[in-house]
């Protein structure tokens, strides 16, 4: 051990470093101890991995992914490089010298920038000399790499493989600087599929609607095999999220130039529960009338996003008492307030079988609607009031659908006679004929017995099966077919309809404004609910909620005598009417076994859009006959509350879900294209009445009422 005071000897020999690299160069030329092959244009250049990685971070990243096995070699295919350029570049890495022509200099500098050889990529050709570029702010050259460059592949070859053996000619050269890592014996199929998925990415992002509602397992793990077989793939490819690279064949094609023509109206989507249910029954309809390209479909919005505390448990609820379900408020956000009357559950449940009245009123500023609730009259349980047939209550066609069931089953517009007293009486008939709360399941399947078809057509109630829906019937029509109208025309038509709604009943609207766009020789589709097996024409999209079975009430329903409902049934016209230009209105909700409602009134110029009544002596009928005695209300399930100025649709029993459930309360189209109105019906007792959308006019009278402002 030497003392600290003794001097140290420093010996430096720069020639030795030079000689060592020259010896490595000789080994590289004679392929001694070379463990990597650089291939370009079908020829190979041997090299040492340590030298390449010491001179270039590009090779460092690639070679550390694929270490050569004992006695094996890594083959790097450098696409887009000339073999002469590659040789001169490798010679410079070993000797720090390079002799090139001016044409070759540009190729070598370009290759050096691709391979990130630090001592060469900073050079530039000026005046026939390679000089160092002035150091300043330099761009990050990684972002300037061509993104379309194919990666360099690496594979392990046997030691006996000759370095200068030409490659097969069918291999296409890759762009410069890209790398594909390729293991020996493995093909490039998964990796090319990954690139094809990346090319189809833009097409995948354009697709919309139902394909995104249910992602397939192939989307969630689209290319695990390509990642396992190609673990050292280029970072540009691994940056792509495999969940995005889904096969584009899973999605329907969208014609983009047709999309701006549609008017924004709310559209109901089928719930996932319906898609998975067994199609035990299907909705049957007549497909005799061809589709009209000019018709407009009012889409009804399905309220699916309910808050958890708002969704009741229908399984334990009593038939006539249940907590309120503000399902109409769920979708439009939490900004709407509910009054204390609405919030109070079962506050006054003494009056069973009665329904509170709900009014729709337009606020003066024209921005929103308010729903006004009225307490039911006390004398309705003793003597049901008879509405005034000459009241100022008429419904503009296409603005307020009769019921949720009718909104779903016939999305086309229903036109009513505006100047005839038949309109008011027709609506009274439709309302006073109530629904039976004892029928939890409405199976839209019609029996084919002659007695039912000829004498009393009705909805066959099958209480043993839950309501199921055939998803094959939900094929969506083309966007252009549903909305073959211009935005300006539709806006003006909506404004005219709302102007008539708000101005009172004395002014008759222009008939042309209330007609559907199919008035020029086109015909609105006629829906005949006739027999099983016929699908709704055109695959109209509509949604039904999940159905619940109630075994206790089913047994009561089977034992219930049919004679209790015979009285109101005799006065009602058949549901199915063989009319060429008629449109059958089916009132939603639950039906008594023999109760069916349909009405019609022809009008000049609107025969193909009218509701039909098979017999025209309806105005002469007594309205009291339409409501059975009060003693039978609870048994027959009739709930009627009629006043002289307003009309409320009969409500099915609370706590049960059916196609007319308030979960599917549609939005009414308003004057602006994006304005939507939710209507929720509440009774005074606070219990839920899942009524159909009430067609109630804004009341211009100044009578004192209990008004509840639902919307803020």
From Swiss-Prot:
- The residue ranges of the BTB domain are 34-102
**Short name of one Pfam family:** BTB
Alphabetized UniProt keyword annotations: Differentiation, Nucleus, Phosphoprotein, Spermatogenesis, Transcription, Transcription regulation
Enumerate the subcellular locations listed in this protein's record, separating them with semicolons: Nucleus
* Composition bias type Acidic residues, residue spans: 702-712
For bias type Basic and acidic residues, the affected ranges are: 229-238, 303-313
Entries under InterPro entries matching the protein: BTB/POZ_dom (IPR000210), BTBD18 (IPR042915), SKP1/BTB/POZ_sf (IPR011333)
Where composition is biased (Polar residues), the residues are 218-228, 396-410
Annotated GO biological processes are: cell differentiation; male meiosis I; piRNA transcription; positive regulation of transcription elongation by RNA polymerase II; spermatogenesis; transposable element silencing
- Which residues fall in a compositionally biased region of kind Low complexity? 277-288
- Which stretches does the entry tag as region Disordered? 157-176, 212-355, 374-410, 653-676, 691-712
Q: Residues bearing Phosphoserine?
A: 420, 671-672
Q: What is the superkingdom listed in this entry's lineage?
A: Eukaryota
Give the CC-aspect GO terms.
Answer: nucleus
**Any idea what job this protein has?**
Specifically required during spermatogenesis to promote expression of piRNA precursors. The piRNA metabolic process mediates the repression of transposable elements during meiosis by forming complexes composed of piRNAs and Piwi proteins and governs the methylation and subsequent repression of transposons, which is essential for the germline integrity. Acts by facilitating transcription elongation at piRNA loci during pachytene.
Q: List, alphabetically, the PANTHER family matched.
A: BTB/POZ DOMAIN-CONTAINING PROTEIN 18 (PTHR47639), BTB_POZ DOMAIN-CONTAINING PROTEIN 18 (PTHR47639:SF1)
Q: What protein does this entry describe?
A: BTB/POZ domain-containing protein 18
- Which organism is the protein's source? Homo sapiens
């Amino acid at each position: 051990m030497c003392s600290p005071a003794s001097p140290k000897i420093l010996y430096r020999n720069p020639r030795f470093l030079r000689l060592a690299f020259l010896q490595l160069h000789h080994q590289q030329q004679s392929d001694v101890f070379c463990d990597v092959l650089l291939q370009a244009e079908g020829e190979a250049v041997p090299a040492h991995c340590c030298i390449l990685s010491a001179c270039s971070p590009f090779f460092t990243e690639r070679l550390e992914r694929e270490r050569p096995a004992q006695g094996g070699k890594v083959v790097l295919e450098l696409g887009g490089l000339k073999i002469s350029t590659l040789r001169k570049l490798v010679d410079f890495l070993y000797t720090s010298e390079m002799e090139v022509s001016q044409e070759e200099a540009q190729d070598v500098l370009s290759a050096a920038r691709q391979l990130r050889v630090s001592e060469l990529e900073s050079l530039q050709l000026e005046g026939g000399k390679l000089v160092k570029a002035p150091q300043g702010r330099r761009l990050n050259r990684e972002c300037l790499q061509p993104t379309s460059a194919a990666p360099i592949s690496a594979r392990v070859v046997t030691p006996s493989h000759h370095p200068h053996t030409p490659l097969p000619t069918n291999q296409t050269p890759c762009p410069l600087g890209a790398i594909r890592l390729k293991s020996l014996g493995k093909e490039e199929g998964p990796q090319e599929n990954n690139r094809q998925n990346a090319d189809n990415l833009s097409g995948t992002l354009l697709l919309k609607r139902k394909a995104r509602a249910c992602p397939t397992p192939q989307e969630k793990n689209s290319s695990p095999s390509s990642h396992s077989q190609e673990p050292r793939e280029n970072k540009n490819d691994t940056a792509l999220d495999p969940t995005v690279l889904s096969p584009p064949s899973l999605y329907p094609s969208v014609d983009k130039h047709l999309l701006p023509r549609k008017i924004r109206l709310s559209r109901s989507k089928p719930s996932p529960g319906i898609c998975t249910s067994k199609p035990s029954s299907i909705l049957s309809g007549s497909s005799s009338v061809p589709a009209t390209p000019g018709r407009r479909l009012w889409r009804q919005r399905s309220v699916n996003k309910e808050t958890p505390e708002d969704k009741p448990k229908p399984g334990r609820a009593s038939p006539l008492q249940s907590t309120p379900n503000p399902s109409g408020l769920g979708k439009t956000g939490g900004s709407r307030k509910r009054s204390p009357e609405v919030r109070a559950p079962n506050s006054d449940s003494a009056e069973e079988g009665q329904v509170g009245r709900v009014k729709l009123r337009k606020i003066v500023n024209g921005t929103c609607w308010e729903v006004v609730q009225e307490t039911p009259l006390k004398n309705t349980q003793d003597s049901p009031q008879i509405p005034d047939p000459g009241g100022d209550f008429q419904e503009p066609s296409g603005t307020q659908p009769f019921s949720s069931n009718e909104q779903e089953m016939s999305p086309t517009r229903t036109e009513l006679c505006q100047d005839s007293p038949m309109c008011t009486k027709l609506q009274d008939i439709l309302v006073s004929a109530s629904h039976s709360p004892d029928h939890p399941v409405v199976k839209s399947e019609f029996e084919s017995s002659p007695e039912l078809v000829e004498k009393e057509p009705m909805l066959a109630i099958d209480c043993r099966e839950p309501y199921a829906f055939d998803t094959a019937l939900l094929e969506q029509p083309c966007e252009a077919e549903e909305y073959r109208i211009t935005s300006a025309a539709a806006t003006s038509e909506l404004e005219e309809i709302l102007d008539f709604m708000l101005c009172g009943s004395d002014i008759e609207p222009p008939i042309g404004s209330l007609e559907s766009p199919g008035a020029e020789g086109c015909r609105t589709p006629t829906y005949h609910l006739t027999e099983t097996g016929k699908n709704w024409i055109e695959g109209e999209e509509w949604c039904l909620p999940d159905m619940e079975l109630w075994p206790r009430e089913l047994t009561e329903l089977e034992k219930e005598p049919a004679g209790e409902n015979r009285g109101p049934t005799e006065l009602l016209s058949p549901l199915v009417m063989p009319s060429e230009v008629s449109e059958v209105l089916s009132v939603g909700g639950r039906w008594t076994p023999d109760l069916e409602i349909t009405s019609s009134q022809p009008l000049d110029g609107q025969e193909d859009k009218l509701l039909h009544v098979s017999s025209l002596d309806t105005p002469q009928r007594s309205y009291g006959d339409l409501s059975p005695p009060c003693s039978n209300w609870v048994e027959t399930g009739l709930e009627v509350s009629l006043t002289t100025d307003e009309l409320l649709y009969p409500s099915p029993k609370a706590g049960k879900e059916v196609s007319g459930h308030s979960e599917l309360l549609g939005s009414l189209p308003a004057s602006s294209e994006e304005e939507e109105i939710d209507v929720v019906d509440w009774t005074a007792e606070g219990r839920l009445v899942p009524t159909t959308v009430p067609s109630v006019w804004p009341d211009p009278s100044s009578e004192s009422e209990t008004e509840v402002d639902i919307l803020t």
